């Protein structure tokens, strides 16, 4: 099932909550069944300070498990579990009705236990990022976007700074675009530790 609830305690504040649950069972030869469970939930708050600025903060939780249920012994043995906690914040401010500053940050805690790991081991990693972007419109024809992002990846103690610059110039019905950027993507726990 999936449910979503929206509540507005103030004209300037919107709260959103969601929850979901999933269960499936599959019979196997003998007295064992595969069981699959998923649970997810989250909360988000949007606050509008004024016509120029707003803030969004949120938290999400996601868990997916697989287990072998031995009906003879009524034993439920979990052999796979993935649990994620995610927190994010995003702030926007508009200058003169046409230039926008955006800043934000994210944090993720990822836990994974799997039968595909050596000795059914488990691993945990933390990733975090902070970013800022300025959308500048000096004329009706010219748009410039400049941004900077910082990423942290706990498993390798990696820190990475990624710049971005983009420009667009309109000539009649045509638009000329150019951009430069760098990026970073941390590997997942599955990519790092699973033995296939």
Predicted regions and their residues:
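Flexible loop and strand-edge segments within Gram-negative outer membrane beta-barrel domains
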Residues: 1-84
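Residues on the lipid-exposed face of transmembrane beta-strands in outer-membrane beta-barrel proteins
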Residues: 3-7, 43-47, 89-93, 130-136, ...
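A short acidic, helix-capping loop that chelates divalent metal ions and anchors anionic groups
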Residues: 26-27, 112-114
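Amphipathic, soluble alpha/beta structural segments
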Residues: 74, 80-94, 100-104
């Amino acid at each position: 099932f999936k449910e979503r609830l929206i509540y507005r305690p103030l004209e300037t504040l919107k709260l959103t909550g969601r929850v979901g649950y999933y269960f499936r069972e599959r019979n196997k030869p003998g007295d064992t069944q595969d069981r699959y469970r998923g649970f997810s939930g989250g909360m988000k708050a949007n606050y509008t300070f004024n016509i120029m600025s707003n803030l969004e903060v949120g938290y999400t939780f996601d868990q997916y498990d697989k287990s072998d249920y031995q009906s003879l012994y009524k034993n439920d043995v979990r052999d796979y579990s993935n649990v994620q906690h995610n927190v994010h914040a995003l702030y926007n401010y508009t200058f003169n009705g046409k230039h926008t500053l955006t800043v934000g940050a994210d944090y993720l805690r990822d836990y994974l236990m799997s039968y595909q790991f050596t000795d059914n081991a488990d691993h945990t990693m933390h990733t975090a990022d902070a970013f800022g972007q300025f959308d500048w419109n000096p004329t009706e024809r010219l748009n410039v976007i400049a941004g900077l992002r910082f990423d942290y990846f706990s498993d390798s103690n990696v820190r990475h700074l990624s710049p971005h610059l983009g420009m667009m110039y309109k000539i009649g019905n045509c638009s000329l675009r150019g951009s430069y950027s760098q990026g970073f993507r941390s590997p997942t726990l599955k990519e790092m530790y699973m033995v296939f």
